[in-house]
């Protein structure tokens, strides 16, 4: 599955009375990057073609260290999911300069015009070059001009177990994974961004009920005990808002069992 889930990776429908467990966790959702090597693994109905292949692409499980949205290192992503699009080169963007304050004296800068390049001068980043997409609980969109972009996704964490005063059953939801890749667009494209939601937590009430999974595919948990639901995956879709237009996916972590912590999402297997 391309999402975190409980009790099984990829579950996207509400759990039933026969699903869920008070004592066991489950796999997290797998990640995916659309490349020439992975295209054959795409489910039937894929709406993408070879012009959307990613380069320098990888998907990393949530039990491995990778770069966090803030730029630090994290081993698995906690909380809600996150997505980012960074402009590497955009053919239709105006030239700009950003001068570092450390330049104390007058300096001349020269640019070659009409060469379809975007320039930055100094160590600071141009604010418009990065688009960040935090969790909102709904789809977000952006329109990308022809150019080259770095795509990054962080999957959401699975829901925690509720201790109800017993520290032995305070299990932690599985952490989300990370996926990254570079895409070059030859024409203007609308993209659809889904930042997954963290799984929910259920207290031990003694009666069965459903704990809904996190936004964007987190599996639900049907239990009478204390357990969490799956975290949602984070993904970016190109051209149309369809599951079959996802070019990059970061898997969400699984929910907890009563006494078992959730499994990490992301990577090839989740």
Please identify what each model-predicted range represents.
Residues 1-7, 173-270:
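Secretome/extracellular-domain signature
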Residues 13-26, 35-73, 203-222:
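Surface-exposed intrinsically disordered loops and tails
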Residues 34-36, 84-91, 182-184, 238-241:
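Short beta-strand-to-coil "C-cap" segments at the C-terminal boundary of structured domains/repeats
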Residues 43-143:
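Enriched but not universal
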Residues 89, 155, 197-199:
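Surface-exposed loop/turn motifs at beta-strand-loop junctions within extracellular Ig-like
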Residues 131, 140, 168-170, 180-183:
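Beta-strand-rich interaction surfaces with strong enrichment in secreted/lumenal proteins
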Residues 144-150, 186-190:
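Extended extracellular/luminal ectodomain segments enriched in beta-structured repeat modules
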Residues 160-174:
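Short, surface-exposed beta-strand/strand-loop-strand elements in extracellular ectodomains
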């Amino acid at each position: 599955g391309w999402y975190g889930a409980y009790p099984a990776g990829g579950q996207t429908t509400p759990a039933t009375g026969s699903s869920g467990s008070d004592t066991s966790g489950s796999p997290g959702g797998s990640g995916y990057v659309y490349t020439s090597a992975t295209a054959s693994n795409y489910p039937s109905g894929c709406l993408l073609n070879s012009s959307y292949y990613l380069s320098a692409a990888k998907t990393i499980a949530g039990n491995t260290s990778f770069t966090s949205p803030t730029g630090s290192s994290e081993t698995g992503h906690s909380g809600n999911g996150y997505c980012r699009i960074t402009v590497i080169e955009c053919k239709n963007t105006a030239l700009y300069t950003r001068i570092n304050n450390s330049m104390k004296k007058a300096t001349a800068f020269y640019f070659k015009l009409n060469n379809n390049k975007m320039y930055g001068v100094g160590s600071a980043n141009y604010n418009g070059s990065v688009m960040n997409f935090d969790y909102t609980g709904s789809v977000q969109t952006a329109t990308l001009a022809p150019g080259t972009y770095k795509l990054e996704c962080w999957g959401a964490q699975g829901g925690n177990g509720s201790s109800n005063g017993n520290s032995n059953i305070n299990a932690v939801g599985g952490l989300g994974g990370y996926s990254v890749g570079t895409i070059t667009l030859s024409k203007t494209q609308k993209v659809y961004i889904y930042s997954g939601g963290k799984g929910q937590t259920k207290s031990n009430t003694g009666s069965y009920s459903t704990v809904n999974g996190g936004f964007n595919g987190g599996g639900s948990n049907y239990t009478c005990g204390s357990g969490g639901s799956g975290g949602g995956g984070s993904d970016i879709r190109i051209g149309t808002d369809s599951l079959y237009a996802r070019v990059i996916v970061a898997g969400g972590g699984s929910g907890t069992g009563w006494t078992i912590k959730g499994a990490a999402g992301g990577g090839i297997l989740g």
